[in-house]
Amino acid sequence: MLNIGYHESTANGLEGLGLEALEVGANTFAFFTRNPRGGKAKDIDEVDAQKLCKIMEENNFAPVVAHAPYTMNPCSADPGLREYAKQMMIDDFARLEYIPNSLYNFHPGSHTGQGSDVGIDLTSTMISEVFKTVKNTSTKLLIETMAGKGSEIGRTFEEVKQIIDLAEQKFGSSLKSRLGVCLDTCHIWDGGYDIVSNLDGVIEEFDKIIGLENLYAIHLNDSMNPLGAHKDRHEKIGKGHIGFETLYKVTRHPKLCNLPFILETPNEQSGYIEEIKMLKK
């Protein structure tokens, strides 16, 4: 069974996330843990969270994917912004305990002129420090693959692997069970990975460098840009440079097909319903 959903609004509460997923034929979804541009978070309604968990359990949902706010930059040159990112992440882990076994993905950040090596070191430090505070959690932290826009880190599989390895060195080997990767099809395409002509080769490269055992979710997006543009502009499924055929193959690939697939395409609900129907055929 295809595990698919899309990025939903939390305007109708946590139960509303589950109800919306059921309404559109989804069995997973993504949501922002807090205001994506500002960082403010609503208080968790425990009863509301319990209702969501009941929906998920009764309908055999795949793991859901919480998304950290865009304002989080763990490798900023500003120590205050790095601390802000760390405290937001720690708070998000506490909030996500109300939705057990969630996945929590974040953008590894932009080094803002310090250089990729410094950025990678700073982000790995934050991950280590977060888990020194978050002692026990059922939530897994996922580093998202990035397109390489501006000074973003995580633009290559090698950079993502460096972040993981450094974080483990700083925290200890037990971090391995808490940390993974979320692969974004638009981002890796814009980053130069040709999944249209060489999907198997890209998957093999990911496995060789990072390990498919560390891949826990996929953001399924088409791209407005040609291969290697480093721009990160999502497009509707089948309307961009990646195309429906390739994205359909991604969802059916034997090494990927059991993962949760999250649509982040520029759509209203009706568009997501249509994309889910297309991909389920």
Regions found by a protein language model. Give the residues of each.
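N-terminal pre-domain/capping segments
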Residues: 1-68, 72, 76-94
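Active-site beta-loop-alpha junctions enriched in small/polar residues
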Residues: 7-11, 34-36, 68-71, 109-111, ...
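Conserved, mostly hydrophobic/aromatic
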Residues: 21, 67, 85, 96, ...
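Active-site acidic/histidine proton-transfer and metal-coordination neighborhood
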Residues: 58, 74-180
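C-terminal helical cap(s) of enzyme catalytic domains, especially alpha/beta-barrels
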Residues: 269-281
